[in-house]
Structures are given as structure tokens and as C-alpha cells.
Amino acid sequence: MEASAILRGARVSPQKARLVAAQVRGLSADSAVNLLRFSSKKAACLIKKVVESAIANAENNHGSNIDDLRINTIIVDEGRMLKRFMARAKGRSSRIVKRSSHITVVVGPAK
């Protein structure tokens, strides 16, 4: 049985989060958590929490063993954008877009 976990509105750019997500896609659950634990990227900490939550959901809801789980899908979608303005020269301003992400992780039995 598959179990999922979703983190909405994570304050990390989707482009940066997708780089980390690509590293753990298809790995076994315990090796993915181990890889994310030692990564220095901000997105790795957020994705690690979602993966651990999905593993806990699988153990609690379906009685799965962590050794039998792998990451079936991991999706990083765009979240809400915060628009800010920064003062520039000669009285002008530029718009700054602070992006956020929705991170979805689905774990299931290894095939």
C-alpha cells in the first residue's frame, strides 16, 4: 500500500527543491533519509521531513516496514509567490518574487 505526505507553502524555490528531489527519486526510504541528512541544501531538510512523515504514515496506517519501502513519486510544484519591491537608483523600484513550493512524497513497497 502506498502512503503519502504533503508539505504546502515551503519557503524554498521550486527550482532548487527539484534538484534535491531528483537525487532521492526511486531510492529506498532509509537510503533517501540518509542521503538527505548529510546534504547541505536547505531544501534537503524540508524534503527529509516530508519523506519521514510519509514513512510514518505507511508504518502507522498500513503496518509497513521501513526496509520494504521506496520513494515511488516525489513532486515539487510551485506554491504562492510573495511579491516584494526593492528600491533602485533614481527613484525607481524593482519587483522581487519570493517563491514557495508544494512538496508531495509517495512511498510504497519496493517492487
Swiss-Prot record:
<comment type="similarity">
    <text>Belongs to the universal ribosomal protein uL22 family.</text>
</comment>
<keyword id="KW-0694">RNA-binding</keyword>
<dbReference type="InterPro" id="IPR047867">
    <property type="entry name" value="Ribosomal_uL22_bac/org-type"/>
</dbReference>
<keyword id="KW-0699">rRNA-binding</keyword>
<dbReference type="GO" id="GO:0006412">
    <property type="term" value="P:translation"/>
</dbReference>
<protein>
    <recommendedName>
        <fullName>Large ribosomal subunit protein uL22</fullName>
    </recommendedName>
</protein>
<dbReference type="InterPro" id="IPR036394">
    <property type="entry name" value="Ribosomal_uL22_sf"/>
</dbReference>
<dbReference type="GO" id="GO:0022625">
    <property type="term" value="C:cytosolic large ribosomal subunit"/>
</dbReference>
<dbReference type="InterPro" id="IPR001063">
    <property type="entry name" value="Ribosomal_uL22"/>
</dbReference>
<dbReference type="GO" id="GO:0003735">
    <property type="term" value="F:structural constituent of ribosome"/>
</dbReference>
<dbReference type="GO" id="GO:0019843">
    <property type="term" value="F:rRNA binding"/>
</dbReference>
<dbReference type="Pfam" id="PF00237">
    <property type="entry name" value="Ribosomal_L22"/>
</dbReference>
<comment type="function">
    <text>This protein binds specifically to 23S rRNA; its binding is stimulated by other ribosomal proteins, e.g. L4, L17, and L20. It is important during the early stages of 50S assembly. It makes multiple contacts with different domains of the 23S rRNA in the assembled 50S subunit and ribosome.</text>
</comment>
<comment type="function">
    <text>The globular domain of the protein is located near the polypeptide exit tunnel on the outside of the subunit, while an extended beta-hairpin is found that lines the wall of the exit tunnel in the center of the 70S ribosome.</text>
</comment>
<keyword id="KW-0687">Ribonucleoprotein</keyword>
<keyword id="KW-0689">Ribosomal protein</keyword>
<dbReference type="InterPro" id="IPR005727">
    <property type="entry name" value="Ribosomal_uL22_bac/chlpt-type"/>
</dbReference>
<comment type="subunit">
    <text>Part of the 50S ribosomal subunit.</text>
</comment>
<dbReference type="InterPro" id="IPR018260">
    <property type="entry name" value="Ribosomal_uL22_CS"/>
</dbReference>
